[in-house]
Amino acid sequence: MGEHMGAVSHTHQPGWFDLVSVMMEGMLANAGREEAESFLYSMGESLAARYPLPDARTVQDLERDMNLQLARFSWGFVQLQPQDAAILLKHHALPAGDGVLDMESWQSALAAVLAGLYGGWLRAQGGGAAVVVALDFNDGNTLHFRY
């Protein structure tokens, strides 16, 4: 997905981005991190249902279709790496927070949404319902998920 490598920052509509940031900050403050991330995961699953992907014949097709949807949201891009018993998903170019919510909390909240989104898309492609997309680690620039 070399054409996406230069996509490091995105513009966001004023007001809308602020609302999302305030909502995430409020969820984390009022519900706690674990409950907020569970809720955000389910919101990602809802987005996957609202923006379904066409049936993919190859991993490359799936990656392309995921990236087309992510581009609609200006949420960066993903690279899929099939393994023997897993698929690694590397999400790059996350939208930067507004600076009000600390970067770690912002990225954790977005990671929860993305995990739900990717999980919903993968289940719709025939993936097992019992297998979840989980964040392996965040290196500060890239979110590394495992399915």
Where do the protein language model's features map onto the residues?
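N-terminal accessory segment detector
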Residues: 1-97, 101-108, 138
